[in-house]
Structure formats: C-alpha cells, structure tokens
Amino acid sequence: ADLFQEADVKLDMECIDVDDEQYDVIIASHVLEHVDDKKASSELLRVLVDGGILVCQVPIVEGWESTYEDDSITSEEDRRLHFGQGDHVRYYGADFRERIRASGFILKNEYTSEGEDVIRYGLLRGEKTFVFQKG
C-alpha cells in the first residue's frame, strides 16, 4: 500500500490490524523481500480463513540453496548492490518454500510465467508465482 498513497486500506504486514480469519485470498506480490518475512508469514496465516489461499511472488534464485540476507547491510546503496533494490532486505533461494511452510502454509502449486500469461497478467517472463494454502 505504500506505493499507492491513495490506497483504501493500508496495513503493516508484520502486524496486520484485523481480526483472525478475515480473508479467503491474499496476494503478496513482491512484498516479503521488504519486511520481516517470518512475522509477515505468521500474520498472513492468522488473517486467512481455514483453507484460505496465499498467492505470492518474490525475487528468487532457484540455483541458490539458501536465501541471502544480512542484517548488517542497511544502506540503500549497499542493499541495491546485494539485493538488487535499495529497499530489499533479502534475495530468496530455493529454501523460500520451506520458509513459508514453516509458518504453517502448505505449498499447493507454483507456476513459471511464460507465453501469453506474461502479457495478459503483466508478469516477468520466467517469474515464479507460488500458491500456498492455510492448512
């Protein structure tokens, strides 16, 4: 919501100010790399109804076994150098799935954008979309 200052609702993903089990579907498109993803994942799980769906996209390098993050990297310039963008705090590796599952989500599916979907949905070619479910 910080990108769109005119948003109807602005929420802190690390401390979502709504009651438990309020949403059927949540789309988190390129936000988890900006926040404490453990806190955010727990909050997303809390506000989803049982069986609710989390659709998620993050910058990920599948060839990396582990997520790259370093709390000592704090300047915008250094974050841009290390994480590709000045407000990112990590670059995910193949362990991304397990990081989200550790919060209680079940990985239902994942898609790699290609062909007509790239244009139709405004995705980057080769971008991963993950679909998790509250178990």
Task: Specify the residue positions occupied by each region the protein language model found.
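Core SAM-dependent methyltransferase catalytic element
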Residues: 103-135
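Conserved SAM-binding loop
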Residues: 1-73, 94-100, 129-135
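Conserved aromatic-histidine-acidic binding/catalytic patches
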Residues: 32, 36, 84-88, 120
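A broadly tuned preference for mixed-charge, low-complexity surface segments
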Residues: 19-31, 80-82, 105-112
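Short alpha-helix
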Residues: 84-110
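SAM-dependent methyltransferase
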Residues: 66-87
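Exposed loop/turn and edge beta-strand positions of beta-sandwich/beta-sheet ligand-binding modules
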Residues: 22, 86, 125-126
